[in-house]
Amino acid sequence: MRQSALIVTVAVIALIAGMGVRGLISAPMNQSSQTPLPEFSLPDLSGKQHSLSEWQGRVRVINFWATWCPPCLKEMPEFTALQSQYSDKGLQFLGIALDDPEPVKEFIATHKINYPILMGQDQGTKIAHDLGNLVDTVPFTVIVNKKGQIVKRQMGELTGEQLMEIVTPLLQEK
């Protein structure tokens, strides 16, 4: 009887801990106040440095991803479609790959990505952490308004529908 009680207790604790970790990873990180996006620069696949200020004045969706991450790869076709549809309205996607360059080059060669992909590697992981990705998970997405303020941080997959609920009002701001 004692052993059964111990097993049940351990199972309940494991269940509660698992739910807490799952909630931390999959739940959107809501932020009540907008904070400025820190400036940083990263290279593209050709080695050319790009600063975030290149896209100042646009609503930016900054997505940290990796080629080995199934949810990351699932998001990308929707992001590509939304970039095509809303680019002229002020939306700009930026992908920050947390991979080595070779797998990223291979991925880009076989997929039609229509937004800039920057190479984050180790520096990208630190930047994601500084932006609020405290558990170093991918995908991790940061949404920035036209004024350069972070309005949303999302750990885990983000659907096009969820994204547009956040982005649509931002695109209408002056």
Please state what every model-predicted region is.
Residues M1-S41, K174:
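N-terminal targeting signals for export/organelle localization
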Residues E39-R60, Y86, A128:
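A short beta-strand-turn-helix
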Residues F40, F64-W65, F107, Y115:
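Conserved hydrophobic/aromatic "anchor" residues
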Residues Q56, F64-A81:
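Conserved redox-active cysteine motifs that mediate thiol-disulfide chemistry
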Residues R58-R60, F64-W68, D100, T137:
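Short pre-active-site segment immediately N-terminal to redox-active cysteine/selenocysteine motifs
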Residues L73-K112, D122-H129:
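Structural microenvironment flanking redox-active thiols in thiol-disulfide oxidoreductases
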Residues A109-I113, G120-T168:
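Thiol/disulfide oxidoreductase modules built on the thioredoxin-like
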